Amino acid sequence: LIMEEITIYHNPNCGTSRNVLSMIRHAGIEPTIIEYLQTPPNRETLIELLQSMGISARELLRTNVPEFEAYGLANQAVAEKDIINAMLADPILINRPIVVTRKGVKLCRPSETLLDILPVPLPSPYIKEDGESVNPIEVKGEKDVIDD
């Protein structure tokens, strides 16, 4: 087993979350698994995760759950702190999986996003639940930005 500290905020009922967890294990790493619906992050942790990902609470919101409507979160005027309050009250509003590695923190949707922050390359192609293959060759270090 490769000694790497990786944490995944995981929902076992989510296919993307399961794929990302399997990809981490496929790379030879056993991550710390936080089933965030059972043990949601506290305010400080949630804010830290958002800052590390460089996204707003709105960008982390799940919009396809009844709670999204119930809290009136479709209204763009809802303040960041109020979105965070709703997420803390109802963690189902937090999109997943969030993965923390030494290379960064990301909301890994689609699951291939994991490759951007996975500290080691996949040893071989990983086959997702739907049969789609993720190739280790796609793992890049620093991305070259090419302007069109």
Where is each model-derived feature located?
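Non-globular targeting/processing and membrane-anchoring segments
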Residues: 4, 88, 93-95, 100-148
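Compact, basic/aliphatic-enriched, mixed alpha/beta core segments that act as assembly/interaction modules
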Residues: 59, 70-102
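Glycine-rich loops and low-complexity Gly/Arg-rich segments
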Residues: 32-34, 55-60, 85-86, 123-126, ...
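Structural alpha/beta surface segment adjacent to cysteine/selenocysteine redox centers
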Residues: 7-12, 16-80
